[in-house]
Design a protein with these regions (language model features):
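Polar, glycine-rich mid-to-C-terminal structural blocks
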Residues: 48-55
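Active-site Gly/Thr loop motif
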Residues: 55-69
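Short secondary-structure transition/capping segments
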Residues: 11, 240-243
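Catalytic alpha/beta core of large soluble enzyme barrels
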Residues: 24, 28, 61-65, 74-240
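Acidic, glycine/proline-rich low-complexity segments that act as flexible tails and inter-domain linkers
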Residues: 38, 198, 244-248
């Protein structure tokens, strides 16, 4: 969480300062006057006010590592070029095309079905495949075992080192992930695409994680992911019974309604 906090602060500091420097060249956006930026309110300020309003000061961030006086002075003097500066987008499709996880999400699964307007696609964690090849484990039979486990490495016969390395989002501590995103949100003026992962059936658990996200000051969540939606087809080839084979034979058209 500490690393995420410091990294996001660095991005925020430079993004806001750059927008103010652009305002010096090209002027502020049209409705800058009277805005929160104009009033000297940065994302960290509005975040702190929100937590105070909700009386959650115990989780209020203790400032940051950087000296923001330069940013505040620049905004006061030159304004801001962009009314909206930062957001974290989902990036699922482009992430999977490039072989990485979407957005700021943890590993979803080492094998799952991804559905979009173009159809359904198998998404495989290529790093996992490479590691299994190095261990001499990867084979057609092992690939079927991964399918049977729905990409859940905790169900595979592999070393604990790899089970920990490729632990899926469903096995992560959701409250810790919420804490990580709260560390990001305090520096970001817009929202964060943040999926919640659920392998429980308890309504209380769902209520608890959504309330935790709200209390942490997150502006948004995205999808609620359940295990069932990511299940993969167990076999790439359908096995037909002897009766089905006879009924569907081209030499026996009268036995199949579809052929009549």
């Amino acid at each position: 969480v500490k690393y995420i906090d410091e990294l996001t602060e660095f991005f925020s500091y430079n993004a806001i300062l750059s927008s103010s420097e652009l305002a010096q060249e090209r002027g502020s956006y049209k409705t800058f006057s009277g805005s929160l930026w104009d009033k000297g309110q940065l994302p960290i300020d509005t975040y702190n006010k929100l937590l105070d309003f909700r009386k959650k000061s115990g989780s209020k961030p203790e400032g940051g590592k950087l000296d923001w006086s330069e940013v505040r002075e620049s905004i006061s003097k030159y304004g801001i070029r962009n009314s909206n500066i930062m957001a974290i987008a989902p990036t699922a499709t482009i992430g999977y095309i490039n072989g990485v996880e979407q957005s700021i999400e943890p590993n979803f699964s080492v094998l799952f079905v991804y559905e979009n307007k173009s159809g359904n696609f198998y998404i495989t964690n290529e790093q996992f495949v490479e590691d299994m090849k190095k261990e001499g484990l990867w084979s057609p039979r092992f690939a079927e075992a991964v399918k049977e486990a729905d990409g859940d490495v905790t169900l595979l016969d592999i070393s604990e080192k790899y089970k920990e390395k490729y632990k899926t989002a469903f096995d992560r501590d959701m409250f810790k992930l919420i804490e990580c995103n709260a560390a990001r949100q305090k520096w970001i003026d817009q929202g964060i695409s943040f999926n919640l992962y659920n392998k429980n059936t308890s309504l209380k658990y769902l209520n608890d994680i959504y309330m935790a996200a709200w209390e942490a000051g997150l502006k948004t969540t995205y999808y609620l992911r359940n295990r069932g939606a990511s299940k993969v087809e167990k076999s790439t080839k359908k096995e037909y019974t002897e009766e089905e084979q006879i009924a569907c034979s081209i030499a026996n058209p009268e036995a199949c309604e579809a052929c009549q």
